[in-house]
């Protein structure tokens, strides 16, 4: 059994209205060996990929595919490859369901195996791995098909890692789904998060949560924490006192002038990188300064704000979500060491590396060790049952934090404050980092401070909070880019056939041009726009 040809259809095609991969396979001798004639094959397949039990196949119910495997005649290997390729993508976090296997108009033993995909590289790899799975579990009398070593668990882990590398981030994926729900087509423009929404002159672009409507000057202001603080201060909005410093000694002097504890952070930074909070000694300030300057040569020393850490998301001038961010932490059970508790936390399937999943793994770094040392603890210490220990001082999800939805609880004064702040910076989508004792009470009453305004804020904490109600924060972005009634498609015509395709295309283009349209045309001769 081997793959003779691979075709990728990236748009509507003969088989489906969505992208599919078509493999031309030759079963060779296996044409005479459907699953019913391969003793133990089905059992070994289901032992290796037990989630295939959920495939309905032609029976449209769980277990349908398994019934096909066990029927008197069984099913052929092309059909098996189709289902494995689909399931591998599902296991890697890509929800695809469509597939079909057909042998019409092909030589005996050859079949077209068609299955859907989201990421092309992942879909192609799924087909290759599916073939290797089949060859590996063939019964002994067919073992001469492939005798190379094969560790399915390791192969699956490598495949999932490939899928995670190629997958859209959570925020971009949510925006793409919101576009699909509104029948807005989208195209990925690079291997990162740059996505085109809509076609032609109606298109918009997003890169994560930056949009084609985001002003560059607004992003520049938001990235300059000192400038942001000054603008907000001029409007009478609550901000901490801060200074820019250029060497460790100056950082210590400013910290002493502000009064300990203080915060040290890079002037231009993201995702909480090199942000050190609650610094209480000159030595800690010097150490934090050195780390911050690796991110940006200009460093900020800021008064430390006590209270809870909130992210207020503002889209198109309106607060759409609020989350309380809780720093990465462990909870004692009276038996396990702190190191073991961290391992247990990271076993949560929702946690991954970086921004690939809903939550990020907790990493024990210098900041965590400093907090342990200050508390007289080590990684080998055992916490009493129920005792919470924070391994971070900031609640960024990118450093292992969790989120609690507070959208319905924000006080009206705090909502207005956040909307004014984002409007002052000029962002269409902005995240306000706000520290206060209680978001349900006005900052005018209990105090609080805006410590940062974020361009391109992450959506993870709102889409999938650890506690509370998930919020649709992607929909408002799409509705802002494409208000109700606005167009997002241009008329497209596809011309196919045996002969005369280019001539017919030119004729149609000419007729449309005479009607006053600016026509784009792609033929075997080249690509033309308005005749050029």
Model feature map: region roles:
Residues 115-257, 270, 512:
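Conserved N-proximal alpha/beta basic substrate-recognition cap immediately N-terminal to
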Residues 1-181, 318-321, 326-333, 337-340, ...:
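ATP-dependent carboxylate activation and anion-phosphoryl transfer catalytic cores
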Residues 482-532:
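Phosphate-binding loop of NTP-binding sites
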Residues 182-183, 258-260, 296-297, 308, ...:
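Short coil/turn connectors at secondary-structure junctions
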Residues 364-383:
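C-terminal helical accessory/scaffold domains
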Residues 198-203, 256-259, 314, 442-449:
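A short, glycine/Asx- and small/polar-enriched loop/turn
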Residues 39, 45, 204-366, 370, ...:
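Active-site nucleotide/adenylate-binding loops and adjacent lid/helix of ATP-dependent enzymes
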């Amino acid at each position: 059994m081997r793959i003779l040809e691979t075709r990728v259809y990236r748009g509507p095609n003969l088989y489906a209205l969505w992208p599919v991969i078509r493999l031309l396979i030759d079963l060779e001798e296996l044409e005479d060996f459907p699953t019913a004639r391969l003793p133990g094959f089905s059992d070994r397949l289901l032992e290796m990929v037990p989630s295939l039990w959920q495939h309905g196949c032609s029976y449209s119910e769980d277990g349908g595919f398994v019934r096909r495997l066990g029927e008197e005649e069984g099913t052929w290997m092309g059909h098996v490859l189709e289902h494995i390729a689909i399931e591998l993508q599902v296991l890697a976090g890509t929800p695809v369901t469509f597939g079909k296997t057909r042998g019409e108009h092909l030589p005996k033993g050859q079949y077209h195996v068609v299955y859907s995909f989201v990421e092309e590289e992942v879909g192609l790899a799924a087909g290759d791995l599916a073939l290797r799975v089949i060859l590996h579990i063939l019964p002994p009398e067919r073992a001469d098909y492939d005798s190379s070593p094969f560790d399915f668990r390791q192969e699956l882990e490598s495949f999932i890692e490939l899928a995670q590398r190629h997958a859209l981030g959570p925020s971009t994926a949510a925006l793409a789904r919101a576009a699909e729900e509104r029948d807005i087509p989208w195209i990925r423009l690079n291997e990162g998060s740059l996505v085109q929404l809509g076609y032609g002159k109606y298109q918009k672009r997003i890169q994560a949560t930056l949009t084609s409507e985001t002003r560059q000057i607004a992003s520049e202001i938001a990235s300059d924490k000192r400038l942001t603080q000054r603008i907000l201060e001029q409007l009478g909005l609550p901000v901490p006192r801060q200074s820019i410093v250029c060497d460790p000694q100056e950082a210590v002097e400013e910290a002493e002038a502000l009064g300990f504890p203080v915060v040290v952070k890079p002037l231009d930074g993201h995702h909480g990188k090199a942000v050190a909070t609650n610094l209480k000694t000159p030595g800690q300030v010097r150490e934090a300064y050195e780390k911050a300057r690796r991110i940006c040569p200009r460093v900020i020393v800021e008064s430390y704000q006590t209270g809870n850490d909130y992210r207020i998301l503002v889209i198109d001038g309106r607060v759409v979500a609020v989350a309380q961010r809780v720093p990465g932490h462990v909870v004692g059970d009276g038996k396990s060491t702190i190191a073991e508790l961290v391992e247990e936390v990271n076993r949560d399937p929702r946690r991954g590396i970086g921004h690939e999943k809903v939550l990020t793994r907790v990493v024990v770094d210098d900041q965590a060790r400093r907090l342990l040392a200050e508390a007289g603890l080590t990684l080998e210490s055992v916490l009493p049952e129920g005792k919470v220990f924070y391994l971070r001082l900031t609640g960024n999800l990118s450093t292992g934090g969790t989120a609690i939805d507070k959208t319905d609880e924000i006080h009206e004064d705090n909502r207005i404050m956040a909307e004014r702040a984002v409007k002052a910076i000029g962002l269409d989508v902005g995240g306000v980092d706000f520290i206060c004792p209680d978001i349900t009470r006005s900052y005018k009453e209990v105090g609080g401070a805006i410590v940062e305004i974020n361009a391109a804020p992450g959506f993870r904490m709102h889409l999938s909070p650890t506690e509370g109600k998930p919020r649709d924060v992607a929909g408002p972005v799409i509705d802002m880019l494409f208000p109700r009634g606005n167009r997002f498609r241009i008329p497209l015509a596809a011309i196919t056939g045996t002969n005369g395709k280019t001539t017919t295309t030119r004729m149609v283009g000419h007729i449309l041009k005479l009607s006053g349209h600016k026509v784009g045309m792609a033929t075997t001769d080249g690509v033309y726009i308005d005749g050029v």
